[in-house]
């Protein structure tokens, strides 16, 4: 009946979506003052009705850097097509590519969850992990990559770096 229609309509998400074109970068502040820096050809969305009231959850595709406002009562979560990152207050980057999703933690601590088995790993400042869609595994990355945030900082650094890595970093940046 009509009452059912209103119930469904009232509970339907009120999505707010922010997108960037290739080559464009955009800083977005969420309702709780969390900063999201979107890289080119990326998007995020959140439910305006529920964000910061029931939970702090966003969905994304592409590459984004998050500086999360601390709120222990409501953890912040980011979902990609295959993974989820949950935090209290920290700064980190998610880079979702067709075959792998990578998380780089700058400050604080995150829980990185992936796959149907909901495998998870805790990452702290300076740590990175990758989830491979092909082999369905999370791998903690031990070597630090100073150029992971180059798109955000505007700086690339190379010292005795193999040429293939220089080319990879340059193609990510440009």
Question: Where are the regions a protein language model picked out?
Answer:
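A residue-level detector for the "anchor" residue at the start of short, highly conserved motifs
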Residues: 2-174
């Amino acid at each position: 009946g009509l009452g059912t229609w209103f119930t469904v309509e009232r509970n339907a998400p009120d999505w707010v979506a922010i997108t960037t074109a290739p080559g464009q970068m955009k800083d977005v502040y969420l309702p709780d003052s969390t900063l999201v820096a979107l890289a080119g050809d990326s998007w995020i969305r959140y439910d305006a009705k529920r964000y910061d009231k029931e939970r702090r959850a966003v969905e994304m595709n592409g590459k984004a850097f998050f500086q999360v406002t601390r709120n222990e009562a409501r953890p912040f979560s980011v979902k990609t097509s295959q993974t989820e990152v949950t935090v209290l207050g920290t700064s980190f980057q998610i880079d979702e590519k067709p075959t792998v999703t990578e998380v780089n933690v700058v400050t604080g601590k995150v829980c990185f969850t992936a796959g149907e088995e909901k495998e998870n790993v805790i990452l702290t400042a300076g740590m990175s992990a990758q989830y491979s869609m092909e082999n369905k595994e999370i791998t903690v990355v031990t070597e630090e990559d100073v150029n992971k945030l180059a798109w955000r900082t505007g700086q690339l650094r190379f010292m005795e770096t193999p040429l293939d890595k220089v080319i990879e970093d340059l193609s990510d940046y440009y």
